[in-house]
């Protein structure tokens, strides 16, 4: 099994604002993909994320407001199905630190390399959303290769 790991600091004193950006349709659509359907604020909910060429459905499996969000990929690209996505939040001075994990990839295929870079880009979009009020979700995100 292989994992994608990132750490990012968001200059904010409101961990609740970051948590809401991870658990509401409005929040998710403002930093990840504007084509988001469903709410992530209850365990068991399914959130549908769509991008230009495809997308995936994610089940909310754990919530510990305002410090932890855990998802499991239910539908989507074969490499993503069964993987889990975790956001751990903690206050550290003037920053909210996010420890991000996209876990349990069966193997480190080329698509995982692409997704690792895209996760970094979307986490920077989340940072921008909280710090400036404007994120860069798909379709206005940074395009990195011919897969998007």
Report each predicted region and the residues it spans.
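Hydrophobic ligand-binding cavity/cleft-lining segments
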Residues: 1-38
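Short structured motifs
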Residues: 4-5, 44, 84-86
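Hydrophobic-ligand binding "helix-grip"
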Residues: 38, 50-97, 103-106
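Short coil-to-beta transition motif at edge beta-strands of beta-rich domains
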Residues: 41-47
